[in-house]
Amino acid sequence: GSEMCIRDSILIDYDTGTVLAQKNAAQPFPPASLTKMMTSYIIEQRLLSGALKENEPILMTPEAWCKGSSEESCMYVPVNTTAPVIDMLKGIIIQSGNDASKAMAQHIGGSETTFADLMNEEAKKIGMTHTHFMNATGMPQEGHQASAEDLAKLAQAIIKNSKKYYPIYS
């Protein structure tokens, strides 16, 4: 038959929220780079509220910087230089940049750990009940998890609440 070889999945109707198909949708798993959906969502909400400006310079700290030899996906902003928020946001969404994610997390939260707390607060607001964030990138870390169902809720929130920035995702 046409049985999909997928472990965890969900398909929802965006307009109604109706679940059309699902498989282990509430089962938590390590979300890897899907984590960056929440990182970018928080940045977008701060831009829309005026708390951040698109042209605001963000420092690429030594902690956030990709050394080039790493296995991570990066946008490769040189260490100790700056890039505007809008470029960092595009680097997170398009290139899955861990460096941009960490630099933005440090800028907004003061540290990546504090930013993860903000991510968890936002997850609660959206109704993500099987999700817990430990970092802004999705790098493997004990206790860092999400479910397909929760990520669908986050995708809905991005489409609904970040209309201005949503085209970057396509």
Task: Give residue ranges: language-model regions.
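Active-site-adjacent loops and short helices of periplasmic peptidoglycan-processing enzymes
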Residues: 2-3, 7-149, 156-160
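Conserved active-site loop region of the serine DD-peptidase/beta-lactamase
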Residues: 161-170
